[in-house]
Amino acid sequence: MSFTRRRFIQATGATAAAAALPVRAQAGPIRVGLVTVKTGPLASGGIDMERALVQRLNERNNTMAGRRVELIVADSGGVPAQARTKIQELVERDNIHIMIGPLDTASALAADDYIRQAQLLTLSVAAAEDMTQRKPNPWFTRGTSTSSQSAMPLADYAAKELKYKRMAVIADDIAYGHEMCAGFMRVFEDAGGKVVQRMFPPLTVPDYGTYLAQLKTDIDAIFLGFAGSNGFRYLRQFNEYGLMGKVKPIGGMTALDEAVLRNMGDEALGIITSCWYSAEIDNPINQKFVSGFRAQWKYDPGFYAAATYTEAAVLEATLNKIGGKIEDKPAFMKAVRSIKVDTCRGPLSFDPYGNVVGSVYLRRVTRKEGRLVNSVIHTYPNVSQFWTYKPEEFLKNPVYSRDWPPAKNLES
């Protein structure tokens, strides 16, 4: 299926006619803009976002709530300023009704004010915490998770079930990595553990040798907060440096995504990660999704693919609730935050801030039919962005970052 960028130009008279004939206007196509990443270190996941969304639309014959759906795809390159420009083009040139995306936290933060200004309906994949916390964007809803939402259950599991006491954390030096590691550290230390080392390599660092040479070995494990293909690159060098038998790696939701797991070998076996999705989730919707995706692309869908497949399900459920009238933006936002919908990740709902409440899965890498998969070993149901903390108390603190919570147990 190919996509072409279309320009919709409205003359003043046409606009007036549309206002006079709302039913006829609503019978036109729903224009969905996908802002993803198809170049750079985040490209493997960004390409999967497009593939999965196209699959979902094809399954619905490109129709939702009785209206045709047109998809317009933009590549931000993972550059925040470019993402904002692409979003503005989608709104002002292509007249999209709704955006799915962007992929990365930094791009979502860069576009936050424009989303507000344009009142752009947004179903986000990006995990930027404060867009559904201290500075909630009224046009922004997220069916995936915040940066830390999957990391906090893993921290609980690491302390209470794996009995880890001393850990290091490493993540890309971007907001997503900072927020994820901060949430992990807070919960791990609240449960009695200590994070004794933190490292934040640049997103595009060509080699992790310097960081591997610095890694403490008198620790139980290291938490990996990488995005895109960086988790694969780090673990490959981690294994080459002979660290696999000395320090146990565990990872956040994108560290060993299926998009990169297919390129790994036995070094990945046994590694535990946490995510709101696994291709191994046993429900009919996911089975259909995985079988269709594998049939076309010859590998399992992961976080990024499931993100757009899930957001499309949220979009369809919301459109069905409002009779397809996506032009009524306040009605759409009220409806989307009130729905409960079954998806490939399981049932989900939304909190008053527009963020998802749903299951988080602990996964272990195993081999199945000759390929590596993220097998589910434990499920935390109904996880919110606030974990077990009271929302009002959680929101009194600063957003998770390199500076908060204070890293009080770091060792030189």
Identify the function of each model-found stretch.
Residues 83, 143-165, 206-209, 231-232, ...:
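Hydrophobic alpha-helical segments within soluble ligand-binding/sensing domains
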Residues 183, 228, 233, 280-338:
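Extracellular/periplasmic ligand-binding modules, especially the Venus flytrap/periplasmic-binding
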Residues 1-16:
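N-terminal secretory signal peptides and thylakoid transit peptides that target proteins
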Residues 1, 21-37:
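C-terminal segment of N-terminal export signals and the immediately downstream linker at the start
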Residues 337-412:
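Solvent-exposed, acidic/polar segments of extracytosolic/periplasmic ligand-binding ectodomains
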Residues 96-199, 246-272:
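Extracytoplasmic ligand/sensor domains, especially the bilobed periplasmic-binding protein
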